[in-house]
Amino acid sequence: MSSPASKPASLLDASLLKPAMVDSLRKLHPRDVARNPVMFVVWAGSLLTTVLVVKDLVAPRPDAAPLGFTVQVTLWLWFTVLFANFAEAVAEGRGKAQAGALRKMRKETTARRWKDGREERVPAPDLRKGDEVICEAGDLIPGDGEVVEGIASVDESAITGESAPVIRESGGDRSAVTGGTKVLSDRIRVRISANPGDSFLDRMIGLVEGAARQKTPNEVALHILLVGLTLIFLLACVTLVPLALYSGVPLSGTAVVALLVCLIPTTIGGLLSAIGIAGMDRLLRKNVLAMSGRAVEAAGDVDTLLLDKTGTITLGNRMATELLPMPGVRMEELAEAAQLASLADETPEGRSIVTLVKDTYKMRPRELQAHHATFVPFTAQTRMSGCDLVDPHPRSIRKGAVDAIVTYVRSQGGAVPDELAQASGRIGDAGGTPLAVADGARLLGIIHLKDVVKGGIKERFDRFRAMGIRTVMITGDNPRTAAAIAREAGVDDFLAEATPEAKLALIRTEQGRGKLVAMTGDGTNDAPALAQADVGVAMNTGTQAAKEAGNMVDLDSNPTKLLEVVEVGKQLLMTHGTLTTFSIANDVAKYFAILPALFMGVFPQIAPLNVMGLSSPFSAVLSAVIFNALIIILLIPLALKGVRYRPLGAEALLRRSLLLYGVGGVIVPFVGIKVIDVLLGAVGLA
């Protein structure tokens, strides 16, 4: 479920558009424009043509371009800068709206600090890292921390949007609590883990607002490319001036500026920042908090996914699927014993056994009290559970691990049939878990527990395989069981009997081969691997150590979310690539629009290059400048929403991008510039 902070604002939302328009004007300040070298060149060109307009108004020059032409070009050049600013402001505005919603979650509370064996009430902002506070039912937790004593039900809907309460307890992987969440029951003692201003909510607000956003490596590389292209075209346009003078071509300063602006990659230059901001925004709407844009980008380049079996690939609860009686044992006898041994078992496995017996063998659950039964709980030492009956005659029914039940039967003087090992082996080979059932000295049979693979997960892995991403299942199961589940789920490889050290070693091995690795984790023992992975997604329900080690936090604590994180990263990279291709392809059409129009009068030989048949040199330049500005505003929705994600390999994606955005980037300007030329002629503006 999405959190309140993650609901996206519509692009046409007035509350978003009005501030964005104001911000786009504010961003005309040289300090803001200078952060984007491409748009700074456009800004400088706009300023230069503005000076030319004022100069022509004050002292008209006989050799100057028509004043109306210079004014129109100047206005559209300023619009180009404003549209680029508007794209960035809209992307930032969505983040500011989310930050506003997050700020509303902050509540000034009084904390019950535990110090020197007694409670004292202090304002929550006065708490420091290491302080301990007491929280009881109805209290708001005053700050981020770890439960060091007690267990409680906590409402985290203010942060995660999930209405169902969660359990937080000391000493495990569910000990982390977040400031602003509410204790619903019981009493806990919390050790504060963040100073004021460094809390989870503070970090969310800072990241959402973009205050902590840094350019990703791909953005830096793309900026270098765009700056290089801009310098090349700047030098080319500067050299045109002496060539034009030598050739006797009347080339105005306005035309040179217009040519430069149309040739440099203004489309991607104007949208680049908005694309990056929107990428982090899309991830946040999936309730995943990325600590940096670098992490989002790395997710798009991931080569290997390490996925925990439980909760990610399988449902996590083993379900009883069949009963296998031993020779000489009736199915009804095994079903009755399995049911009796499970009636007081509140685990998902125990409930599934009762349900299987009821639905398949039509045996209604019986009351243990009627048999004067005593429930025998499961322990790590015995590895079995069951019940002892008194009426109508004494019985000791047990179910549990096969080797534990075998030991129990033999201790009662019973014999173990050879068929037991064969049946257990078949279940293990199929990826299941066998539970043996005994009635005193008689071994009755086996219950087949199966870890159910999530629906649709295999198709999802097929999509990643098509993109060249390798999937590895991480499990504590034995190799035989792990291999069976891996086959059923469709993963490429598995790591059985996994330990934290084995996970870390696997990540380092993959990285040693030049691969980028992504994984999820929630426990303190996952922290080293999360820190080592290129993309480490920590669960919000996990420990503070895990959340600090990872570079993303999943507020929903859903391990499957890693797959969506990778898709968002891929979409971000695809959007960068496709719009860059489109922008550079645009320049080709604008080249054919402006250059022939400027020089065709002196050099008739280049007339065939005027493939658009534009009506006049002034109309050609003005049409290209108008198209150059309008295409930015038209592409803002695509920059914010992202290019549609398709699970294809790198070569297939490249071919598709070149065909759709490369060829399309050439054709669209030809059509657009010609249409604008016709319209300008129709209204008498050129």
Curated annotation (Swiss-Prot):
Residues at the active site: 308
SUPFAM superfamilies: Calcium ATPase, transduction domain A, Calcium ATPase, transmembrane domain M, HAD-like
EC number: 7.2.2.6
Superkingdom of source: Bacteria
Transmembrane intervals: 38-58, 64-84, 224-244, 257-277, 592-612, 620-640, 666-686
Catalytic reactions on record: K(+)(out) + ATP + H2O = K(+)(in) + ADP + phosphate + H(+)
Binding site for Mg(2+): 522, 526
Topology relative to the membrane: Multi-pass membrane protein
NCBIfam families: ATPase_P-type, kdpB
Summary of subunit composition and partner proteins: The system is composed of three essential subunits: KdpA, KdpB and KdpC.
HAMAP family (alphabetical): KdpB
Protein's UniProt name: Potassium-transporting ATPase ATP-binding subunit
Species annotation: Myxococcus xanthus
